[in-house]
């Protein structure tokens, strides 16, 4: 018999210790991985609820199981809030991840072997935008576009040239490591010229879009996909939305999610999404996203003043790439040194990177998490200076130790969950 007082600590000490160690790491380390964030206790309450027990294959009011009247209500709330948040006419909240949202979108708009355009992984795209090791590059004919080397911005002329040459079924706009503002209207213009669908993957900027501080792709794209974590700060999961009136496309999208590539939805995660969407509709969420941008720019300016090269010479969103080629530092070594200083980053390829993806010559930094715990410009500048202190001599253990103690002291002043 199950008892409400059951807990992990008393039953599985090894697992509990690992969980507590991760809690301590999150509290004591500065999180600068651009795709990570801290979700709210309300979201975690939803994810730890008894909704996890319910199987609900199908969609609200059209289920294959009984007893779904309350999870129907939960999913309806999530759908309506997602539509309100992004100005969409359609939403599917069931994808378990951004990658599965992309998989479903591809299935709805293409057949195996069809051609699509996507941003090159080496220039800031995502695995699901056509990488040869991913389903998107294996099942479909992926053609990659990249950045204009002189500006560090998307090469729209190349996108149009490739579109005219290959006549793709779908053009994918979106990124995992691009610090500029994407011209969604230009992408739609190119897509219309070749009678292609425009799909936007806004996983990285969804929170910024929701707050109105980054252009909304919904009015331009046929289909928009996103994760619900990252800047949106919700549970780990995916979402598909559309501003289109094309009900045939909506039905294809629903069928591609279920039964196309998923079975039962995760009702507890959908509840977490509903909570996160409600949080994102509040005025303070816009203030948060504005500060994310301010903090990112403060870090960029500080690092540039210290002699570090920033790809595209700045940022217009929550992330930026540090090019370490001229410093003769690998991204792998920089990642490790900063990790020892309790500053968590991720190594990342930069344009024309001479090193392998496992080594790289750059770092990707983002400010959603530090802003979520209350950092403002002064703290962002301080963190940027600490990064430079470590990178100036990554073999200096005394400097790393000094920065680590400073990081721990700052984190103690700004607890993630106060």
Curated annotation (Swiss-Prot):
GO cellular component terms attached to this protein's record: cytosol
UniProt-annotated binding residues for (6S)-5,6,7,8-tetrahydrofolate: 121, 125-127, 356-358
* Gene, per the UniProt record: glyA
Q: Which reaction(s) are listed as its catalytic activity?
A: (6R)-5,10-methylene-5,6,7,8-tetrahydrofolate + glycine + H2O = (6S)-5,6,7,8-tetrahydrofolate + L-serine
Assembly behavior:
Homodimer.
Q: What is its EC number?
A: 2.1.2.1
- N6-(pyridoxal phosphate)lysine-modified residues are 230
Localization annotation? Cytoplasm
Q: Which GO terms describe its biological process?
A: glycine biosynthetic process from serine; tetrahydrofolate interconversion
- Which pathway features in its UniProt record? One-carbon metabolism; tetrahydrofolate interconversion; Amino-acid biosynthesis; glycine biosynthesis; glycine from L-serine: step 1/1
Task: Give a short account of what the protein does.
Answer: Catalyzes the reversible interconversion of serine and glycine with tetrahydrofolate (THF) serving as the one-carbon carrier. This reaction serves as the major source of one-carbon groups required for the biosynthesis of purines, thymidylate, methionine, and other important biomolecules. Also exhibits THF-independent aldolase activity toward beta-hydroxyamino acids, producing glycine and aldehydes, via a retro-aldol mechanism.
The protein's matches in Gene3D superfamilies, at most eight in alphabetical order, are given as:
Aspartate Aminotransferase, domain 1, Type I PLP-dependent aspartate aminotransferase-like (Major domain)
Single annotated GO MF:
pyridoxal phosphate binding
What UniProt keywords are attached to this protein's entry?
Amino-acid biosynthesis, Cytoplasm, One-carbon metabolism, Pyridoxal phosphate, Transferase
Under the heading InterPro entries, the entry gives:
PyrdxlP-dep_Trfase (IPR015424), PyrdxlP-dep_Trfase_major (IPR015421), PyrdxlP-dep_Trfase_small (IPR015422), Ser_HO-MeTrfase (IPR001085), Ser_HO-MeTrfase-like (IPR049943), Ser_HO-MeTrfase_PLP_BS (IPR019798), SHMT-like_dom (IPR039429)
Full protein name: Serine hydroxymethyltransferase
**Protein family according to the UniProt entry:** Belongs to the SHMT family.
